Amino acid sequence: MGSDKRVSRTERSGRYGSIIDRDDRDERESRSRRRDSDYKRSSDDRRGDRYDDYRDYDSPERERERRNSDRSEDGYHSDGDYGEHDYRHDISDERESKTIMLRGLPITITESDIREMMESFEGPQPADVRLMKRKTGVSRGFAFVEFYHLQDATSWMEANQKKLVIQGKHIAMHYSNPRPKFEDWLCNKCCLNNFRKRLKCFRCGADKFDSEQEVPPGTTESAQSVDYYCDTIILRNIAPHTVVDSIMTALSPYASLAVNNIRLIKDKQTQQNRGFAFVQLSSAMDASQLLQILQSLHPPLKIDGKTIGVDFAKSARKDLVLPDGNRVSAFSVASTAIAAAQWSSTQSQSGEGGSVDYSYMQPGQDGYTQYTQYSQDYQQFYQQQAGGLESDTSATSGTTVTTTSAAVVSQSPQLYNQTSNPPGSPTEEAQPSTSTSTQAPAASPTGVVPGTKYAVPDTSTYQYDESSGYYYDPTTGLYYDPNSQYYYNSLTQQYLYWDGEKETYVPAAEASSNQQTGLPSTKEGKEKKEKPKSKTAQQIAKDMERWAKSLNKQKENFKNSFQPVNSLREEERRESAAADAGFALFEKKGALAERQQLLPELVRNGDEENPLKRGLVAAYSGDSDNEEELVERLESEEEKLADWKKMACLLCRRQFPNRDALVRHQQLSDLHKQNMDIYRRSRLSEQELEALELREREMKYRDRAAERREKYGIPEPPEPKRKKQFDAGTVNYEQPTKDGIDHSNIGNKMLQAMGWREGSGLGRKCQGITAPIEAQVRLKGAGLGAKGSAYGLSGADSYKDAVRKAMFARFTEME
């Protein structure tokens, strides 16, 4: 009993509790926190094991979208975009990174406020600003500011001393570092991220031990961190009213894009931009090259006054993921593919005030040997791919342009990185001469011997010659023109081009002769393919010829009939000139595509003059010659229907005094038109008549309502509905005091019981009122003692009594 310490009532039920209770409560809270953390860690492990089988097929972007379904105001920032960053701050473990974390932000602040504040400062501008929000849309009080480079982030932190003042509140800035991913390992064969518990690669079955052994020490984190690698990049912070043309104009110095390469995301309701756009290129290599160019710009890229953030568009495909080591080699191979596009854009990008200088890897630099090896592999691959393709010829200029296999120019979006020189640089292209500058060494005395096999030309080793404007090849002594892709031999004064099949330089004269002769087998194949096309082209040319002749004949007849107005004469002249020009064009040109483009316009003009011919052309197909024969036969027969000697119309059986009257009859008479229509229909077959009637039915509008009115007549309009009017019935209400107050009321009986008699006043000495109190109507807005506030009206008075009393009161006031 002595050892037991009893707790008093005061200690047990005090206001703040006893000290023992507080100690026990603190210990219980610490145990619960440890238990929660252990449970969270174990649940994470169980969740990782549970989704082991299909997590490999999902990208981190989808996982973040599942975890964070809310979006910010722009529509493309989610709360989970920085889910892999460490939010906890430890000054001792802080490392520099290009992402800065802002803590302690006001709840009412938005991303636009942070972005405007950042842009107001001088110095490097951020690439992206993301405010972290809860699922309800309320700010969590911190944001991430991402810069393009690490140097920009460090200089920003040093300039602001790791502190900012936003809306009068001091904000602390810290570097945000990604959490280390020790649980994942990267397969070196298929570049797939696998969980730490998986001993073999999920895709290719490679051993985990082999992948860990190949990773050099000290690069574990860099090898395990995987970036996205695809052919599409995303442009962020797009203005709400930016159009696709503005994006193409901003990216034109760095890439050759088409409208279908850019996808601008808009809101379905407001039709305004949601703040981001996608740019898809021909390959992932081109996308990585463009991304490097845009991220290295100083100042950063701006579109419509907005600083644009650039990054890879995160795809759901795991095949596009490459480690850092493999990406370096891919960039080296991509540089060779982009070289051809850089040459082709020289003239279009160079202006009058400056020239374009392209920088290539020169001998002696780091990685030049590896760069050359990848270039040769890339060129050999495309030589094999392009070996069976034929070179296209230009039909308009007449010159033959051959595409070299060494410099493959793709029709997909092309990349070119250029550096403009000062305005004082020479821009005119001079004729190449034997004397070279210091940058181009002297040509070899032997020169290029036709027929000798040479190595594939490497455009990266060429040196720019300022005196001639060409690029000099030190291995062969030739000058290279990037615009025409021809080589110039200064010794023989001859132009050459590279033939990938023969692996030699061929003179341009031989190329034209070879192009004209061609191979018999190829020629026969082309003739077989072009037979139906040439037949269709001949038919179109014949149609044009007939149309031109008919239009000119109508013009002559119209001139002979009478003198028209000047405007009509000019219009006829333009139509005839258009017909002649169209016919001449179709006689000269052999391309079917151009004929199909010009034919509808010319036929449309001719249809106004000859509606029946338009129906005939629509009824027949252009592949048969029966149509041509039929039209020619009808025209010849129609010409015989007029006797120009007797000045008579044989169809209508009428004779006219002169030629002008006969022409006017043919052009303006309704009778002649009806007879001509009947005559033409009689010459057509049943199938042709059905086709003509079908077209007339389609062209003519049938007014069914008018036909119905003619058949049944117009019905009489219905009588308008009258609204039913109900007379409000009189309501009999109770009027007990209309004839005065009698003795039977309760008040009278009570007063009589207290000693009051009728006719005497109230009070002890009967000095009070003798008449009962009546309700009087008072003027609205007037006080109780105001003059004229009451006219002696009561609630039982009629309108006539009220007017009479009011008039009497005004009369007494005047007195």
Swiss-Prot record:
Protein name: RNA-binding protein 5
Protein's organism: Mus musculus
Chain ranges of the G-patch domain: 743-789
Gene Ontology biological process terms from the UniProt entry: apoptotic process; positive regulation of apoptotic process; regulation of alternative mRNA splicing, via spliceosome; spliceosomal complex assembly
UniProt-recorded Gene Ontology molecular function terms: mRNA binding; zinc ion binding
Keywords, ordered alphabetically: Apoptosis, Metal-binding, mRNA processing, mRNA splicing, Nucleus, Phosphoprotein, Repeat, RNA-binding, Spliceosome, Zinc, Zinc-finger
Phosphoserine modified-residue sites: 18, 59, 69, 72, 78, 444, 621, 624
Annotated localization: Nucleus
Keyword 4Fe-4S included in the entry's annotation: no
Role, per record: Component of the spliceosome A complex. Binds to ssRNA containing the consensus sequence 5'-AGGUAA-3'. Regulates alternative splicing of a number of mRNAs. May modulate splice site pairing after recruitment of the U1 and U2 snRNPs to the 5' and 3' splice sites of the intron. May both positively and negatively regulate apoptosis by regulating the alternative splicing of several genes involved in this process, including FAS and CASP2/caspase-2. In the case of FAS, promotes production of a soluble form of FAS that inhibits apoptosis.
Predominant localisation class: nucleus
Region feature Sufficient for interaction with ACIN1, PRPF8, SFRS3, SNRPB, SNRPN, SNRNP70 and SNRNP200, mapped onto this chain: 452-535
Entry GO terms, CC: cytosol; nucleoplasm; nucleus; spliceosomal complex
Region span, Disordered: 1-93, 385-468, 508-539
Family recorded in the similarity comment: Belongs to the RBM5/RBM10 family.
Low complexity bias (residue ranges): 393-410, 426-446
